[in-house]
Curated annotation (Swiss-Prot):
Lineage: superkingdom: Eukaryota
UniProt key word Disulfide bond: yes
Region Active core, annotated ranges: 150-162
Keywords: Antibiotic, Antimicrobial, Cleavage on pair of basic residues, Disulfide bond, Immunity, Innate immunity, Secreted, Signal
Functional note: Antimicrobial protein that is an integral component of the innate immune system. Binds to bacterial lipopolysaccharides (LPS). Acts via neutrophil N-formyl peptide receptors to enhance the release of CXCL2. Postsecretory processing generates multiple cathelicidin antimicrobial peptides with various lengths which act as a topical antimicrobial defense in sweat on skin. The unprocessed precursor form, cathelicidin antimicrobial peptide, inhibits the growth of Gram-negative E.coli and E.aerogenes with efficiencies comparable to that of the mature peptide LL-37 (in vitro).
Cellular compartments annotated: Secreted; Vesicle
Transmembrane residue ranges: none
Signal peptide range in chain numbering: 1-30
Main location: secreted
Protein name, entry field: Cathelicidin antimicrobial peptide
Post-translational note: Proteolytically cleaved by proteinase PRTN3 into antibacterial peptide LL-37. Proteolytically cleaved by cathepsin CTSG and neutrophil elastase ELANE.
């Protein structure tokens, strides 16, 4: 009788171990981050280490170069962040913050790992000095000035046309 109970007990433990063996790989797979999620975690770390007053939010994410199957292998990343209106000490997620007008733009490069449990990143960010970023500011300011000048010209034409209309004497 005792042998039968030991057999049932052994069978139960075998079943439990089998189920754990099936579930554990699923738990490990569930802990692998996507490329974008890993970058967002890195941006959270950048915001925590930053001495700037406001949070940064992702502006542009370059496509991933290589995605091998090992989540522990560092993956090269490059992305651009921009300053938001949210103070760094806030508990708000940067993704919920609006970009600050004329906020600082930084270009970031480095590596991230996709393993959520042991995730790590090595990222450095510098002020974005790429020419097209400067050109974007130039064209935006030029468009604003042209718009203001156009409004003044239209107003002058209206004033001129009003002066051409014969006036009736009162």
């Amino acid at each position: 009788m005792k042998t039968q109970m030991d057999g049932h007990s052994l069978g139960r433990w075998s079943l439990v171990l089998l189920l754990l063996g099936l579930v554990m790989p699923l738990a490990i797979v569930a802990q692998v981050l996507s490329y974008k999620e890993a970058v967002l975690h890195a941006i959270d770390g950048i915001n925590q280490r930053s001495s700037d007053a406001n949070l940064y939010r992702i502006l542009d994410l370059d496509p991933s170069l290589t995605m091998d199957g090992d989540p522990d292998t560092p993956k090269p990343v490059s992305f651009t962040v921009k300053e938001t209106v949210c103070p760094r000490r806030t508990q708000q997620s940067p993704e919920d913050c609006d970009f600050k007008k004329d906020g600082l733009v930084k270009r970031c490069v480095g590596t991230v790992t996709l393993n959520q449990a042991r995730g790590s990143f090595d990222i450095s960010c510098d002020k974005d000095n790429r020419r097209f970023a400067l050109l974007g500011d130039f064209f935006r300011k030029a468009r604003e000035k042209i718009g203001e000048e156009f409004k003044r010209i239209v107003q002058r034409i209206k004033d001129f046309l009003r002066n051409l209309v014969p006036r009736t004497e009162s």
